[in-house]
Protein backbone atom coordinates (compact mmCIF):
# COMPACT_ATOMS: atom_id res chain seq x y z
CA UNK A 1 0.00 0.00 0.00
CA UNK A 2 1.59 3.26 -1.15
CA UNK A 3 0.51 6.67 0.02
CA UNK A 4 1.02 10.42 -0.07
CA UNK A 5 0.98 12.19 3.31
CA UNK A 6 -0.20 15.70 4.20
CA UNK A 7 2.48 16.98 6.59
CA UNK A 8 2.31 20.28 8.47
CA UNK A 9 4.75 19.06 11.16
CA UNK A 10 1.97 19.41 13.73
CA UNK A 11 1.24 16.78 16.36
CA UNK A 12 -1.51 15.16 14.29
CA UNK A 13 0.30 14.82 10.97
CA UNK A 14 3.50 13.51 12.59
CA UNK A 15 1.48 10.95 14.56
CA UNK A 16 -0.45 9.98 11.42
CA UNK A 17 2.86 9.44 9.62
CA UNK A 18 4.18 7.18 12.39
CA UNK A 19 1.00 5.10 12.32
CA UNK A 20 0.98 4.95 8.52
CA UNK A 21 4.58 3.72 8.38
CA UNK A 22 3.58 0.89 10.68
CA UNK A 23 1.21 -0.35 7.96
CA UNK A 24 2.20 1.08 4.59
CA UNK A 25 4.82 2.64 2.33
CA UNK A 26 4.64 6.43 2.51
CA UNK A 27 6.02 7.51 -0.84
CA UNK A 28 6.09 11.27 -0.29
CA UNK A 29 5.06 13.97 2.19
CA UNK A 30 3.60 17.29 1.06
CA UNK A 31 3.87 20.52 3.05
CA UNK A 32 1.88 23.55 1.94
CA UNK A 33 2.92 27.20 1.95
CA UNK A 34 -0.13 29.45 1.76
CA UNK A 35 1.47 32.41 3.54
CA UNK A 36 0.61 31.24 7.05
CA UNK A 37 2.45 32.79 10.00
CA UNK A 38 4.12 29.51 10.90
CA UNK A 39 5.15 28.48 7.39
CA UNK A 40 8.91 28.68 7.94
CA UNK A 41 8.66 26.57 11.08
CA UNK A 42 6.32 24.09 9.41
CA UNK A 43 8.72 23.62 6.50
CA UNK A 44 11.78 23.41 8.78
CA UNK A 45 10.25 20.83 11.09
CA UNK A 46 8.54 18.85 8.33
CA UNK A 47 11.90 18.54 6.61
CA UNK A 48 13.43 17.15 9.81
CA UNK A 49 10.60 14.66 10.21
CA UNK A 50 11.07 13.45 6.63
CA UNK A 51 14.83 13.17 7.09
CA UNK A 52 14.21 11.14 10.25
CA UNK A 53 12.09 8.64 8.33
CA UNK A 54 13.91 8.86 4.98
CA UNK A 55 10.84 10.09 3.08
CA UNK A 56 10.80 12.39 0.07
CA UNK A 57 9.51 15.86 0.97
CA UNK A 58 7.84 18.35 -1.37
CA UNK A 59 6.77 21.92 -0.62
CA UNK A 60 3.69 23.15 -2.50
CA UNK A 61 3.32 26.94 -2.74
CA UNK A 62 -0.22 28.30 -2.88
CA UNK A 63 0.24 32.07 -2.94
CA UNK A 64 -3.22 32.54 -4.42
CA UNK A 65 -4.79 30.99 -1.30
CA UNK A 66 -3.29 33.62 0.98
CA UNK A 67 -4.51 36.36 -1.37
CA UNK A 68 -8.15 35.32 -0.94
CA UNK A 69 -7.91 34.56 2.78
CA UNK A 70 -8.77 37.00 5.55
CA UNK A 71 -7.73 34.93 8.53
CA UNK A 72 -5.48 35.51 11.52
CA UNK A 73 -3.30 32.62 10.32
CA UNK A 74 -2.29 34.77 7.34
CA UNK A 75 -3.25 38.37 8.11
CA UNK A 76 -0.83 39.68 10.72
CA UNK A 77 -3.06 42.69 11.38
CA UNK A 78 -5.53 40.29 13.02
CA UNK A 79 -4.99 38.81 16.46
CA UNK A 80 -4.72 35.05 16.87
CA UNK A 81 -7.15 34.03 19.64
CA UNK A 82 -5.60 33.03 22.95
CA UNK A 83 -7.19 30.31 25.07
CA UNK A 84 -6.62 28.60 28.40
CA UNK A 85 -6.80 24.90 29.14
CA UNK A 86 -9.99 25.59 31.09
CA UNK A 87 -11.50 27.16 27.97
CA UNK A 88 -10.98 23.85 26.18
CA UNK A 89 -12.28 21.73 29.05
CA UNK A 90 -15.12 23.73 30.61
CA UNK A 91 -15.54 26.81 28.45
CA UNK A 92 -18.69 27.47 26.43
CA UNK A 93 -18.77 26.11 22.89
CA UNK A 94 -18.68 29.59 21.39
CA UNK A 95 -15.10 30.12 22.64
CA UNK A 96 -13.66 27.37 20.45
CA UNK A 97 -16.13 28.15 17.67
CA UNK A 98 -14.96 31.78 17.57
CA UNK A 99 -11.34 30.63 17.59
CA UNK A 100 -12.03 28.26 14.70
CA UNK A 101 -13.66 31.06 12.68
CA UNK A 102 -10.64 33.29 13.25
CA UNK A 103 -8.20 30.74 11.80
CA UNK A 104 -10.45 29.29 9.09
CA UNK A 105 -8.93 29.25 5.59
CA UNK A 106 -11.48 28.84 2.75
CA UNK A 107 -11.60 25.18 1.67
CA UNK A 108 -8.01 24.66 2.84
CA UNK A 109 -8.24 20.95 3.55
CA UNK A 110 -10.26 20.46 0.38
CA UNK A 111 -7.50 22.11 -1.65
CA UNK A 112 -4.72 20.20 0.11
CA UNK A 113 -6.31 16.80 -0.22
CA UNK A 114 -7.18 17.24 -3.89
CA UNK A 115 -3.61 18.25 -4.71
CA UNK A 116 -2.36 15.24 -2.75
CA UNK A 117 -4.75 13.00 -4.71
CA UNK A 118 -3.20 14.25 -7.96
CA UNK A 119 0.24 13.30 -6.66
CA UNK A 120 -1.10 9.95 -5.48
CA UNK A 121 -2.63 9.06 -8.83
CA UNK A 122 0.42 10.18 -10.81
CA UNK A 123 2.76 8.09 -8.63
CA UNK A 124 0.53 5.03 -8.43
CA UNK A 125 -0.39 5.53 -4.77
CA UNK A 126 -3.71 4.26 -3.45
CA UNK A 127 -4.07 6.54 -0.43
CA UNK A 128 -3.74 10.09 0.83
CA UNK A 129 -2.98 10.12 4.56
CA UNK A 130 -4.19 13.02 6.70
CA UNK A 131 -4.12 13.81 10.41
CA UNK A 132 -7.85 14.49 10.65
CA UNK A 133 -8.96 13.64 14.18
CA UNK A 134 -12.04 13.30 16.33
CA UNK A 135 -11.20 16.19 18.67
CA UNK A 136 -10.83 18.87 16.00
CA UNK A 137 -13.78 17.50 14.02
CA UNK A 138 -16.02 19.01 16.69
CA UNK A 139 -15.13 22.53 15.53
CA UNK A 140 -13.61 21.93 12.08
CA UNK A 141 -16.02 19.96 9.84
CA UNK A 142 -13.24 19.27 7.33
CA UNK A 143 -11.69 16.97 9.96
CA UNK A 144 -14.75 14.75 10.24
CA UNK A 145 -15.64 11.25 9.08
CA UNK A 146 -18.36 12.77 6.92
CA UNK A 147 -15.75 14.88 5.13
CA UNK A 148 -13.51 11.85 4.55
CA UNK A 149 -16.42 9.81 3.18
CA UNK A 150 -17.48 12.65 0.88
CA UNK A 151 -13.94 13.08 -0.44
CA UNK A 152 -13.64 9.34 -1.08
CA UNK A 153 -16.85 9.50 -3.10
CA UNK A 154 -15.48 12.43 -5.09
CA UNK A 155 -12.17 10.66 -5.75
CA UNK A 156 -14.02 7.62 -7.09
CA UNK A 157 -14.94 9.90 -10.01
CA UNK A 158 -11.95 12.26 -10.20
CA UNK A 159 -9.05 9.78 -9.99
CA UNK A 160 -8.50 6.91 -12.38
CA UNK A 161 -7.19 4.60 -9.66
CA UNK A 162 -9.81 5.47 -7.03
CA UNK A 163 -7.55 7.18 -4.50
CA UNK A 164 -8.91 7.06 -0.95
CA UNK A 165 -8.29 9.09 2.20
CA UNK A 166 -6.73 7.29 5.15
CA UNK A 167 -7.25 9.13 8.45
CA UNK A 168 -5.79 6.93 11.20
CA UNK A 169 -6.64 9.46 13.93
CA UNK A 170 -10.27 9.99 12.95
CA UNK A 171 -11.66 8.44 16.17
CA UNK A 172 -8.96 9.80 18.48
CA UNK A 173 -8.66 12.83 20.73
CA UNK A 174 -5.34 14.59 21.32
CA UNK A 175 -4.55 12.60 24.47
CA UNK A 176 -4.92 9.32 22.56
CA UNK A 177 -2.87 10.75 19.71
CA UNK A 178 0.01 11.65 22.04
CA UNK A 179 -0.02 8.22 23.66
CA UNK A 180 -0.03 6.43 20.31
CA UNK A 181 2.71 8.66 18.90
CA UNK A 182 4.92 8.09 21.94
CA UNK A 183 4.28 4.34 21.77
CA UNK A 184 5.47 4.32 18.15
CA UNK A 185 8.48 6.53 18.83
CA UNK A 186 7.26 9.34 16.57
CA UNK A 187 9.78 12.22 16.47
CA UNK A 188 7.53 14.72 18.26
CA UNK A 189 10.60 16.75 19.13
CA UNK A 190 10.44 17.79 15.47
CA UNK A 191 6.75 18.73 15.52
CA UNK A 192 5.52 22.33 15.50
CA UNK A 193 1.95 23.02 16.61
CA UNK A 194 1.94 26.78 17.21
CA UNK A 195 -0.06 29.08 14.92
CA UNK A 196 2.82 31.57 15.15
CA UNK A 197 6.27 31.30 13.62
CA UNK A 198 8.42 32.77 16.38
CA UNK A 199 11.51 31.04 17.70
CA UNK A 200 9.49 29.55 20.58
CA UNK A 201 5.87 28.29 20.57
CA UNK A 202 3.56 30.96 22.00
CA UNK A 203 1.92 28.52 24.42
CA UNK A 204 -1.44 30.32 24.37
CA UNK A 205 -2.99 29.86 20.92
CA UNK A 206 -5.63 27.14 20.60
CA UNK A 207 -3.23 24.74 18.88
CA UNK A 208 -0.57 25.17 21.59
CA UNK A 209 -3.20 24.75 24.29
CA UNK A 210 -4.59 21.54 22.80
CA UNK A 211 -1.07 20.15 22.62
CA UNK A 212 -0.24 21.23 26.18
CA UNK A 213 -3.45 19.73 27.56
CA UNK A 214 -2.86 16.47 25.67
CA UNK A 215 0.63 15.98 27.06
CA UNK A 216 -0.44 16.86 30.60
CA UNK A 217 -3.34 14.39 30.46
CA UNK A 218 -1.26 11.67 28.80
CA UNK A 219 1.42 11.71 31.48
CA UNK A 220 4.22 12.26 28.95
CA UNK A 221 6.64 15.16 28.79
CA UNK A 222 6.48 17.03 25.49
CA UNK A 223 9.69 16.00 23.63
CA UNK A 224 9.72 19.29 21.71
CA UNK A 225 9.73 21.38 24.90
CA UNK A 226 12.28 19.07 26.54
CA UNK A 227 14.59 19.22 23.52
CA UNK A 228 14.54 23.03 23.50
CA UNK A 229 15.13 23.16 27.26
CA UNK A 230 18.08 20.75 26.99
CA UNK A 231 19.54 22.82 24.13
CA UNK A 232 19.54 25.96 26.30
CA UNK A 233 21.45 24.32 29.14
Swiss-Prot record:
EC number annotated for this UniProt entry: 6.3.4.20
A GO MF label: ligase activity, forming carbon-nitrogen bonds
Gene3D superfamilies (alphabetical): HUPs (3.40.50.620)
Family: Belongs to the QueC family.
Repressor is among the record's keywords: no
The keyword Iron belongs to this UniProt entry's keyword annotation: no
Species assigned in the record: Methanococcoides burtonii (strain DSM 6242 / NBRC 107633 / OCM 468 / ACE-M)
Cofactor note: Binds 1 zinc ion per subunit.
Signal peptide per UniProt: none
Task performed by this protein: Catalyzes the ATP-dependent conversion of 7-carboxy-7-deazaguanine (CDG) to 7-cyano-7-deazaguanine (preQ(0)).
Name this protein carries in UniProt: 7-cyano-7-deazaguanine synthase
Top enzyme class: ligase
Cofactor(s) required, per the database record: Zn(2+)
Catalytic activity: 7-carboxy-7-deazaguanine + NH4(+) + ATP = 7-cyano-7-deazaguanine + ADP + phosphate + H2O + H(+)
SUPFAM superfamilies: Adenine nucleotide alpha hydrolases-like (SSF52402)
Binding site for ATP: 7-17
UniProt keyword list: ATP-binding, Ligase, Metal-binding, Nucleotide-binding, Zinc
Associated pathway: Purine metabolism; 7-cyano-7-deazaguanine biosynthesis
A Pfam cross-reference name: QueC
Binding site for Zn(2+): 194, 202, 205, 208
Tree of life domain: Archaea
